[in-house]
A protein has these predicted regions:
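N-terminal beta1-alpha1-beta2 submodule of the flavodoxin-like/Rossmannoid cofactor-binding fold
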Residues: 211-285
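Active-site neighborhood of phospho(di)ester-bond hydrolases with catalytic His/Asp-centered motifs
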Residues: 31-33, 55-63, 83-86, 146-150, ...
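Zn-dependent metallo-beta-lactamase
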Residues: 1-27
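Short amphipathic alpha-helix with an adjacent loop that forms part of the alpha/beta core around
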Residues: 47, 114-117, 273-280
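Metallo-beta-lactamase
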Residues: 85-210
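Conserved beta-strand elements of the Class I
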Residues: 22, 29-30, 123, 139, ...
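Active-site metal-binding motif and surrounding structural segment of the metallo-beta-lactamase
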Residues: 26, 37-84
């Protein structure tokens, strides 16, 4: 999506990707919808992917509007479609859609429930507060894929494979999920019991192989609130410029004393999301 701000607050010069997945089997499952601003494109892509078939299940892992906005119209378009979601999601649906129009076509799932599609089977994992209370993740056991909702996401639209995933994933994590370290640790413990070939997040690229292993390592590190690398963040706000001079002087003194990495951030002008990222990344503030 070609936007300059994500959630009207995070600067995203490279835009933002919103992912939705389709599993074609004896039964057809659609994994989440997308942002309402991409309704026409998403619907056209879905129709093309279905190639004449009718979806049986729409899995709602996360009720945040950038992933659920098209649920109502999709349920209307496919009268036999069943919406699969957590009980918490059911409580929220009525605030966004005419729930009465498809209330009888809702399947509530919880931790440990499974949904066979044919060759593929969906296994549901409760992931509350990563980063909304109703979130579920889904493990597909045939191809060993973890559909991770907003977990393992990143800022930016889909780019080439040489891009540094960690750079914008780090800024995304600490601003979106940073205060939910305990909840992320709980999900990682559940994931550690699974054989995973790929992680499919709702934002950013699919992760496999070494990239996936590194992403899991970083999520474990970040969610334990351990510094990722050595460094010092000097953050300041300065009305008349004197505190700014002091902050920059302090940075120079720290470098003279042997500090290998000193980052100086103006809280009034610099990207706040990057400042928060650095506050978590470095051991000294």
């Amino acid at each position: 999506l070609d936007i300059d701000l994500f959630e009207s607050q995070y600067i995203v010069p490279e835009g933002m990707s919103y992912n939705s997945w389709v599993i074609l089997d004896d039964k057809v499952a659609v994994m989440d919808t997308a942002d309402g601003r991409k309704e026409k494109e998403w619907t056209a892509n879905l129709v093309a992917t279905l190639n004449g078939r009718t979806p049986d299940y729409l899995i709602c892992q996360h009720m945040e509007p950038d992933h659920s906005a098209i649920i109502g119209k999709t349920m209307q378009e496919y009268p036999a479609l069943t919406l699969v979601c957590s009980q918490q999601t059911v409580k929220m649906l009525g605030f966004y859609f005419d729930l009465a129009s498809f209330a009888e076509r809702i399947m509530v799932v919880k931790e440990g429930d499974t949904l066979p599609l044919g060759t593929h089977t969906l296994n549901f994992i409760a992931a509350p507060m990563v980063h909304w209370p109703e979130v579920i993740m889904t493990y597909e056991s045939a191809e060993k894929i973890l559909f991770a909702a907003d977990g393992f996401g990143k800022f930016g639209a889909l780019c080439n494979e040489t891009d540094d995933w960690a750079c914008e994933a780090r800024r995304y994590y600490f601003n979106i999920c940073g205060k939910y370290g305990m909840q992320v640790q709980n999900v990682l413990k559940k994931a550690s019991t699974l054989e995973i070939n790929a992680i499919m997040p709702l934002h950013g690229p699919m992760l496999q192989g070494e990239a996936m292993a590194e992403a899991i390592r970083l999520y474990d590190l970040w969610s334990r609130y351990e510094p990722e690398s050595d460094g010092i963040l000097v953050a300041y706000a300065s009305i008349h410029g004197n505190t700014a001079k002091a902050a920059h002087h302090l940075a120079e003194v720290l470098k003279q004393k042997g500090a290998t990495k000193v980052v100086v951030s103006d809280l009034s002008r610099d990207d706040m999301a990057e400042v928060i990222e650095d506050a978590f990344r470095y051991p000294k503030l």
